[in-house]
C-alpha cells in the first residue's frame, strides 16, 4: 500500500490524501483546485516520513513535538506563520513524538520542541526549544 499524508486544504478545508512520494509535484485540492501546500505544515509519521523526506526538492523543516508540551503548544502558531512565509521555498512538517517513537529515536530527540532541517535526505541543522517565527524562518536556511 502506498504511504499517504492526510492534509486539509487551507482554502476550503477539504480533507485530501496525498501520496507521500508525490509531495514535490505541487498538489492541488481535489475539491477547489487550489494549492494544498500553501505554507501549511504537514503531519508526518513513522510510516510516511522517509517518502516525504526523499521526495522533497525543497528543504524539509520538521518540528518534533508532543500535545502535552507547553512550549510546543506555544510555538505552534509561530511554526504555522513561518510556514506561510516559507511557502514555495521550504516544506514544513510536524511529527508527534509520542505517536511516532521510532522516528523520534532515529533522530535522537531528547527534548521537545526540536526542529530538524533536512536537505537532500540528510540532517543539516537542529535547534531545540521554542522559537519565534523569525528564528524558524532563519533555521530553514532559504
Model-derived regions, located:
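Cys/His-enriched microdomains
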Residues: 7, 27, 67
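Short cysteine-rich clusters marking metal-coordination/redox-active sites
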Residues: 9-12, 29-32
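Cys/His-rich microdomains that often coordinate metals
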Residues: 13-16, 36, 76
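Short linker/helix segments within small regulatory modules
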Residues: 18-27
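A short beta-strand-turn-helix
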Residues: 41-60
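Non-catalytic, surface beta->alpha helical segment in thiol-disulfide oxidoreductase systems
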Residues: 111, 116-142
